[in-house]
Amino acid sequence: MDMLHTILNFLLPPLTISFLVLFYPFYLFTKLMSCLKHLHFENVTGKVVLITGASSGIGEHVAYEYAKKGAKLALVARRKDRLEIVAETSRQLGSGDVIIIPGDVSNVEDCKKFIDETIHHFGKLDHLINNAGVPQTVIFEDFTQIQDANSIMDINFWGSTYITYFAIPHLRKSKGKIVVISSATAIIPLQAASVYSASKAALVKFFETLRVEISPDIKITIALPGFISTDMTTPQFKEMYGSDFILSESVSRCAKAIFRGIGRGEAYVIEPSWIKWIFLIKNVCPEIVDYLLDYIFVSYLKPYFKRD
């Protein structure tokens, strides 16, 4: 068996290079055909869309994009008062029917309730937007208790997987879509976000695998936004990283990009799009990205984590 690995180590590099040279033109052609296909935009008028974390941030503004196109909305979050405001705004923007379902995505029974109430009210489900999430603003060793990290994984990862589990039978019937809001930190490490980054990376790998399992019945779009001006960029977060240091994008612009990606059936939405090039550098020359992150941490961030 070791001999087989030795042979593969020797053969695969030249074979891979040859493959890329020979088939790259064909790849470009298929990408062009894919772009032409994406000129078609899905009509979401009358479609039923369930959005978690809809009380603020990306979830709120994605709801507004759907509302403008006449979609019917089921809005989920813990803050009922905020949901009511988002629901009313969505109605004014053009949504014909909006319900709110307060609850916690980290609770399995609540996740079942979200789906059950949506089906009871609308009779179907077309799109599931997994957006609910919480941030992290301390380095790993500065957690007061390690158990405090559990809630990040429970909400950011398990919250999306729980509700997806209950939604799949209904999405199969409607040939629907699942959208998951991950983060650029799933690919590029961010200081003081170790558990947060892990939760977002877990989302990417889970839904990439699920995409294989449930295709072609259900389509999956994975969004990887960078720094976005939402409630998650808390005053503590902005103070730590510095408002000038963070190249934050408006939440409305990000939501529009995600909505366009959903409508075009894109597998991934990376916003802002320049982050794609950082991902490329990370894949080709990971040491360069690691060096830059180390430099940024030592030069800008380390003073915030010094202990008494």
Swiss-Prot record:
The chain crosses the membrane at residues 10-30. The keyword Zinc does not apply. Keywords: Lipid biosynthesis, Lipid metabolism, Membrane, NADP, Oxidoreductase, Signal-anchor, Steroid biosynthesis, Transmembrane, Transmembrane helix. It is a single-pass type II membrane protein. Pfam families: adh_short. NADP(+) binds at residues 53-79, 104, 196-200. It is found in: Membrane. Substrate binds at S183. One of its GO terms (biological process) is steroid biosynthetic process. Its EC number is 1.1.1.-. The active site is at Y196 (proton acceptor). It is an enzyme of class 1 (oxidoreductase). Belongs to the short-chain dehydrogenases/reductases (SDR) family. This is 11-beta-hydroxysteroid dehydrogenase-like 2. The lineage of its organism: Eukaryota, Viridiplantae, Streptophyta, Embryophyta, Tracheophyta. The gene is HSD2.
